[in-house]
Amino acid sequence: MNNNIYEDISKRTQGDIYIGVVGPVRTGKSTFIRKFMEKLVIPNIDNEFKKDRTRDEIPQSGSGKTIMTVEPKFVPADGVEIKIKDTVSLKVRMVDCVGYIVEGALGHEEGGKQRLVSTPWSQEAMTFEKAAEIGTKKVIKDHSTIGIVVLTDGSVTGIDRKSYVEPEERVIQELKNLKKPFAVVLNTLSPKSEETSMLRSELEEKYEVPVLPMNVVEMEEEDIEEVMEAVLYDFPLTEIRINLPKWVEGLERNHWIKSSIITTLKQSIIDIGKIRDIEGIIQGFSELEFLEDTGVDNVELGEGVINIDLQTKQDLFYNVLEEKSGFKIEGDYQLLSLITRLSKVKNEYDKIESALIDAKIKGYGVVAPSLEELSLEEPEIMKQGKQYGIKLKANAPSLHIIKADISTEVSPIVGNQNQGEEMIKYLMEVFEEQPADLWESNMFGKSLHDLVKEQLQSKLYTMPEEIRVKMQKTLQKIVNEGSSNIITILL
């Protein structure tokens, strides 16, 4: 026995499982209740007195066309608590009803006229058919937390299948209107026949609900579990959890991959309300070209939660890496090589990062040497007065980053005064509308950006080598000798 099914049902109904068994008359509703009680409920009642009383309250059932149930009946009269395999506690009560009258059924007329019956719903007697309808509606609306609709192909009663169509349509529509979770059982003497399979497909397409063909008289525990699982799938869907590859989770929320997934999910859930509608979501995701596989990882029926796995295509990871980094990567071997190189670069950058920030903000930054860069000379004995000591000398490179603002100007000759004014006017218009486009303005076959860049580079590389060496020595002397004053003469 699958305890999880009953545990999940218990969660969704807060432990009280009131099952309304409804449908047209002469479909096998009472038989379904009898088999349900015999297979699941009675064996799990601990109290022997309650067990005997419940057995006595099981409704009569029989074959043929004669209506056996004449009024709604609670089985047992009070909800009975059962414990399944000492793990799941449930309070169970089933509700049997007469059902909607079908043409060809017997027992609702006397002498060619409708039988009059007394009911708790009216002080006056009413026709059997009217009482049956009121009772059926009350079972559906007021006395059940879940529903089991029992239909038939007519083989169990000898009544023509066409006679059942109109009343079964009414029952299913009423359950849908009330949004009660329910399952549909097709009672037949030949559940595995081709004709039954065709009827099942026809009913599923017509009512848009799963239909379970079975011979109710021969129903076993496994069949009951299948019916209860079908009911669970008819409960509302409360939460959808999407499992993505970890690298996708690391992308920013507005990245096109995440945006596509979120948009698809929003579009897919518009018409989804029940757990069994999950195929609509799966279908929506399967249309995303960058996904390799989409599937349901797990369904937590007791909570109404569905976990969906989304697997991306293998090359998507490399495409996104290229998009983010600018490096062309076509496989793991290239990725490993790139990571190795970038790791070395990062280690070097980490050393100068702080100094670089200081240079940008304050104009000057220093990179202190690491322990590995220290170079020790041989120790020397030194004399100071009458005492002796040891002199230890160490050398290490330090980096000094200085910010020097470079200014330049471009003064192209464009012709006479009018032409110069026209050029100024044009450049001002571009600057006001789209400042960034100003740099792309064409000047004698080159963009303004290229002209300025050439001027800046020319200034950077015109500093003579000997001047650079002198500046280095000067800085070295200031650092080592601690001079706080410097006189600079530029010639």
From Swiss-Prot:
It comes from Clostridioides difficile (strain 630). Keywords: ATP-binding, Coiled coil, Cytoplasm, Hydrolase, Nucleotide-binding, Sporulation. GO terms for molecular function: ATP binding; ATP hydrolysis activity. The keyword Manganese does not apply. ATPase. Has a role at an early stage in the morphogenesis of the spore coat and is required for proper coat localization to the forespore. It catalyses: ATP + H2O = ADP + phosphate + H(+). ATP binds at residues 23-30. This is Stage IV sporulation protein A. A motif (Walker A motif) lies at residues 23-30. It holds the Pfam family SpoIVA_ATPase. The lineage of its organism: Bacteria, Bacillati, Bacillota, Clostridia, Peptostreptococcales. It is found in: Cytoplasm.
